[in-house]
Each structure stands twice: as C-alpha cells, then as structure tokens.
Amino acid sequence: MNRRHRIYEGKAKILYEGPEPGTYIQFFKDDATAFNAKKHEIIDGKGVLNNRISEHIFSHLGRLGIPTHFIKRINMREQLIKAVEIIPLEVVVRNVAAGSLSKRLGLEEGTPLSQSIIEFYYKNDSLDDPMVSEEHITAFGWAVPQEIEDIMQLSIRINDFLSGLFAGVNIQLIDFKMEFGRLWEDEAMRIVLADEISPDSARLWDIQTQEKMDKDRFRRDMGGLINAYQEVAKRLGIINENEPSRPNGPVLVK
C-alpha cells in the first residue's frame, strides 16, 4: 500500500489526501485532549466511536438538506470528505449553562438558558482560542457578513435537529462546538458544516440522572469516557444492543 500524503494533523484527527481531486480522508485518532492539549491521553477505541457517531449525525443532517463536507464512511476510523477551506472559527451553540459560560458569568452549571446562545471563538491554540465578536471576524477578514449570517442560520437549524435527536434517546444537548468551511463548486461557493460532531465536541447529559456522557469525563478526571461514548452510540442505534460488552471494544452496527 502506498504511503498516503498527510495534509494536516490536529489533536484528534488526521487529514490525508483523498482518492479524487477535491477530497480528503479524515482519520479519527484515539487521542483525548483538553485545555488545548495541555492534558493528553490515548484512550483505546475513542476514535472508532467518534467516527461512527459523527457519521450518523452528518448523514442525518445531509438528508435534511444541511450542507456538510461528509461523503461516506470508509472504515471504522476513516471518512471520505470534501476538501473545504476551513474558516478559522469555532462556533459554539449553548442551550444550558455549563463549562466556560458558567465560569465567566457565575452561573450554576445546568441553568437553562431562556434562548440558545451562539458564540464565536478564534481558532488559535497559542492564544487559547479567544472569544471574538462578529466585528472582530469581519475586521480581521476571517469571514464576511453574509458568511456569518449563513453560519448562524445553519447553526440554529443544526441545534434544533440535534436537540430533538438526542432528546428522543433521553439525552439533553447542553452545548456543542462546530467548524464551518467554504466549499467551492465551479465558480460558486457555499458554507458547509465541517470537522465532526461527537461527544468530543458536545456536552451530553442523561435527562433523568444528569450523568455526563461526553469529554467532560476526561476533562474533570471522572473516568468512564469510553463507557459513556458507547452508551451514546447505543442509544443512537449505532451499537447493537443485543451484543454483550467485550474487552476488545464495542460491537458496531454495519
């Protein structure tokens, strides 16, 4: 097998050159990081679960007409995706106070918000991804006003869908992070959802018990990260519920 050309390696994923022009292969690693990689461990099986959960979500979003970079899953750890020009912003949608919002504003974690909040963060690890305003975004040329409007409208639609999807399996969507990119098709450009949506990038709580089912289990040294991710996958119908737990990892539905 020929050695693939590596385009980019991030904290949790690697991008390789795809088989066709305008495509990449996105590989999900087992690395768990927090606080901009100041905390780092390898957790066996995490990449497999994130790949399948993100595939499940992106496939649903695509069927709803929400444009994404996702083409198809290749194997347990890899997806074929469209090559996009990533906008250097993390877009966070918050439905319930938690994490940095609770710390910044002195809110008790778990406080419901009267409306969903959309926040923008400049993607720069050396600066710890500072929060920025729409004025910062346009002033520094990261995106133009119409692109910001497109991102916000897509974020609202995605949040509405995901909130319902997770509520249907007894999970509350507290908040989640997204990235968007510019997809060029001939002379036309459109904004599409990129990166991933998984328990790595979303806060997910069990509706009844408030048990955390996301990367906060790693951030806060709670343990049980893989079990929590497996439970999310099981509720979404990705893991076969009839299969017993196995030490070699979860059994995934083809």
UniProtKB/Swiss-Prot annotation:
The entry's keywords: ATP-binding, Ligase, Nucleotide-binding, Purine biosynthesis
InterPro entries: SAICAR_synt/ADE2_N, SAICAR_synt_PurC, SAICAR_synth, SAICAR_synthetase, SAICAR_synthetase_CS
Cited Gene3D superfamilies: ATP-grasp fold, B domain, Phosphorylase Kinase, domain 1
The protein's annotated pathway: Purine metabolism; IMP biosynthesis via de novo pathway; 5-amino-1-(5-phospho-D-ribosyl)imidazole-4-carboxamide from 5-amino-1-(5-phospho-D-ribosyl)imidazole-4-carboxylate: step 1/2
GO CC annotation, single: cytosol
Family: Belongs to the SAICAR synthetase family.
Record's catalysed reaction(s): 5-amino-1-(5-phospho-D-ribosyl)imidazole-4-carboxylate + L-aspartate + ATP = (2S)-2-[5-amino-1-(5-phospho-beta-D-ribosyl)imidazole-4-carboxamido]succinate + ADP + phosphate + 2 H(+)
Origin species: Bartonella henselae (strain ATCC 49882 / DSM 28221 / CCUG 30454 / Houston 1)
UniProt keyword Ligase, yes or no: yes
GO molecular function terms listed in the Swiss-Prot or TrEMBL record: ATP binding; phosphoribosylaminoimidazolesuccinocarboxamide synthase activity
Record's protein name: Phosphoribosylaminoimidazole-succinocarboxamide synthase
Top enzyme class: ligase
EC number assigned by the record: 6.3.2.6
CDD domains for the chain: SAICAR_synt_PurC
Higher taxonomy: Bacteria, Pseudomonadati, Pseudomonadota, Alphaproteobacteria, Hyphomicrobiales
Pfam families cross-referenced by the UniProt entry: SAICAR_synt (PF01259)
Gene Ontology terms: biological process: 'de novo' IMP biosynthetic process; cobalamin biosynthetic process
Keyword ATP-binding: yes
